[in-house]
Regions:
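Residue-level hotspots at or immediately adjacent to binding/recognition sites across diverse folds
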Residues: 2-7, 11, 17-453
Length: 453
């Protein structure tokens, strides 16, 4: 179901959104001091007009959501959602047909990628759209697009943006590497011919700052940068480091303020280029410098979500019952972690989003009302108020839609579900045995084609 109002975003519209958010931020800062009942309602964000697929990738402290949606011709557009409205960022002046929005900060700056209108001379698939066009990273705010420079190669992409406007991502160099997969490999990567490096585009700057890989590694990718300027991601060899959407590397890495890499360790395994998505990668870091991600277990057949701190090192978070793989994709400043737990192969298995809090991993579906129309599939982001952004399957339309899950006790007005008589997984086990839902094969193929971050 599309939202009631959908339009191309304008400067005036976004300024109005930001003005409306001022009081919301003040209210939520006061409300965030109070403990809430950990149960949620879920808001289906819908799609852009004519679209059948959308996903949310980031969420601010006042509920502004960034992501991507298909449109009527089947192409993908970077999008924003706020208070019942959908805004089409499109492919902002970059010439291509497809784009996506990933990270978003409190100033409504969006980090994204767009196809250009130029064919990649190596016919690589860096953006993941399968068109063979060059992939261009950008920073966008209030209708203005900043094209981000590369490292001498043809392609780059981004993953996140902090509140200082620093963008984390990856950019190709001009160096050919015979270790790169020259054809589409079993792990879903390729064809890739050039090395790529983790980079940061500092706020207001177009030129990237290279983040060197660990000694012995040749490539890297930066997935998150916090407000302290610390970045996390992965490094490895071009043969065992997988680009998004199923990113993994030989080593999960933290880069300090000087750009020096630090190995975060592993849970017993290393990268496995023979199995999609299996390896080590740090996906996010909060402002306490605590890191979440996924690490290969001994035997290199499965990944498990982890939380890393300087004091504890890498600690496994587990998987949901019956699942074989998991990954922590985001962490807020309260160390609440969201991500995905998967039954089967990372690419083809059934995904189940989770919320991990105080040592307990809960299926997100058990925290929602039983009559929720959208079945959540993956949780990509969480803000400090506990609002969770992701995407789910809508059985009535057979479509996949972005969602925002809102916790009880904050701005949630669902008095019946949020009353003390109904508790979810973290209280009484209301709905805890709700069956997991397998996706139709057609939608599974769509997810494989579009990928996710």
């Amino acid at each position: 179901m599309n939202l009631a109002s959908s339009n191309t975003i304008s400067g005036a519209a976004l300024l109005a959104v930001l003005a409306m958010s001022t009081n919301i931020v003040a209210q939520q800062q006061e409300q965030s001091k109070q403990e809430h009942t950990l149960r949620y309602t879920l808001r289906d964000l819908g799609t852009l007009p004519g679209g059948t697929f959308s996903q949310a990738a980031g969420v601010t402290g006042y509920g502004l959501v960034s992501g991507v949606s298909t449109v009527s011709d089947g192409t993908q557009h970077a999008a924003l959602w706020f208070e019942g409205r959908t805004f089409d960022i499109g492919t902002p002046g970059l010439g291509g047909a497809n784009s996506a929005g990933f990270g978003i900060n409190m100033w409504a700056e969006v980090a994204g990628q767009s196809e250009s209108n130029t064919t990649d001379p190596n016919n690589e698939n860096f953006c993941g759209y399968g068109t063979g066009m060059k992939c261009q990273p950008f920073r966008w705010q209030n209708g203005k697009t900043t094209r981000l420079s590369l490292l001498g190669g043809n392609n780059g992409t981004v993953s996140n943006i902090n509140n200082r406007g620093d963008v984390s991502g990856v950019a190709e160099t001009g160096k050919r590497d015979p270790a790169c997969p020259g054809a589409v490999a079993v792990n879903g990567t390729g064809p890739q011919f050039l090395d790529f490096e983790a980079v940061i585009w500092n706020g207001g700057q177009k030129a990237p700052r290279e983040l060197r890989p660990l000694a012995g590694d040749t490539v890297g990718e930066a997935y998150w940068i916090n407000d302290n300027g610390l970045a996390v991601g992965a490094t490895g060899l071009c043969s065992n480091t997988q680009l998004p959407p199923f990113a993994a590397g030989a080593h999960a890495v933290l880069w300090d303020n000087y750009g020096s890499p630090h190995d975060l360790g592993n849970l017993g395994g290393t990268a496995n280029p023979a199995i999609r998505g299996i390896g080590n990668i740090a996906f996010a870091i909060n402002n306490r410098n605590h890191v979440v991600g996924a690490s290969a277990l001994a035997g290199n057949a499965n990944d498990e979500a982890f939380l890393w701190t300087k004091e504890t090192g890498m600690v496994p978070l587990g998987r949901l019952d019956g699942d074989t793989n998991s990954a922590g994709l985001a962490v807020n400043n309260k160390d609440e972690v969201v991500g995905g737990s998967i039954n089967g192969d990372i690419l083809t298995g059934d995904p189940h989003p989770f919320l991990w809090r105080n040592g307990v991993m809960a299926p997100l579906s058990t925290l929602l009302p039983p009559d929720t129309d959208l079945i959540p599939l993956l949780a990509n982001a969480i803000n400090d108020d506990g609002e969770i952004a992701g995407f789910g399957f809508q059985p009535s339309s057979q479509e996949i839609h972005a969602f925002l899950a809102i916790p009880c006790g904050r701005t949630n007005t669902d008095k019946q579900w949020c009353s003390e008589d109904h508790r979810g997984f973290f209280g009484r086990s209301d709905g805890a045995d709700r069956p997991k839902t397998a996706l139709p094969e057609s939608l599974r193929r769509l997810l494989q084609q579009l990928g996710h971050r």
